[in-house]
């Protein structure tokens, strides 16, 4: 159901408001580049800083622009189950193809609490649900045993795994049904995750280099590992440098360097710090662009 590259798309801002002109151009580039789908209102999209109205509008406009050409997996997670349900119902009504639901953050629920949270969301969703496990941001880890229980729900179809723990991911794959999809939540682990049975990646770097990310994953899935590895190692410095500061600070800076949007973020996120690390990142991405990587 979920396979390939899904771009965790940034949310451009201009003078404090969502810059839809830039956003639509980014979406069109994603469509042209052949990604499987886009994921608006996720971590990379600065969803915690969006108002409820902005969140709903951004998803609506994404569906309208994409118009069935690629999938839209809408981020509707919250640390309030009630709010997550409301956002999920709204996104489903707008015609998304799937839901991305993150671990409840700050509350620190137990495994049973997360099981009940995600079950409640899945019960109201008319679209497939992709769980999102990112303990580095949420301070709770959705364990393989809990994922296995959740995978029995007919609407829970996949997980975006961002623990960075291949052993844990292997347990998830081995304990869940074969039609339950695991996607990497870390660009730099894309090929390792594919090698243990993952189906793709929810990517940050594909905002900037969508075609290269698509080619890397497509070649691997077609069995051309060597060609896939060549692209992977070309992109690896970008995968690493895209996290020299908290995501999405570096990737939004890089998108502004390439002219896609302004480098405006919403507090408490701030622009990429000037210095050696940012200059190195800038040099890397422009060198790849000069080499024809897109």
UniProtKB/Swiss-Prot annotation:
Pathway listed: Amino-acid biosynthesis; L-lysine biosynthesis via DAP pathway; (S)-tetrahydrodipicolinate from L-aspartate: step 3/4
Domain of life of the organism encoding this protein: Bacteria
Family, as annotated: Belongs to the DapA family.
Chief location: cytoplasm
SMART domains, per database record: DHDPS
GO biological process terms held by the UniProt record: diaminopimelate biosynthetic process; lysine biosynthetic process via diaminopimelate
Active-site residues, record numbering mapped to chain: 132, 160
Protein name from the UniProt record: 4-hydroxy-tetrahydrodipicolinate synthase
Record site feature (Part of a proton relay during catalysis), residues: 43, 106
Top enzyme class: lyase
InterPro entries found in the cross-reference section: Aldolase_TIM, DapA, DapA-like, Schiff_base-form_aldolases_AS, Schiff_base-form_aldolases_CS
Entry's localization field: Cytoplasm
Catalytic activity: L-aspartate 4-semialdehyde + pyruvate = (2S,4S)-4-hydroxy-2,3,4,5-tetrahydrodipicolinate + H2O + H(+)
Enzyme Commission number(s) from the entry: 4.3.3.7
GO MF terms held by the record: 4-hydroxy-tetrahydrodipicolinate synthase activity
Gene this protein is translated from: dapA
Keywords recorded for this protein, A-Z: Amino-acid biosynthesis, Cytoplasm, Diaminopimelate biosynthesis, Lyase, Lysine biosynthesis, Schiff base
Assembly behavior: Homotetramer; dimer of dimers.
Residues annotated to bind pyruvate: 44, 202
Its job: Catalyzes the condensation of (S)-aspartate-beta-semialdehyde [(S)-ASA] and pyruvate to 4-hydroxy-tetrahydrodipicolinate (HTPA).
Pfam families membership: DHDPS (PF00701)
Any single Gene Ontology cellular-component annotation: cytosol
Keyword Ribonucleoprotein: no
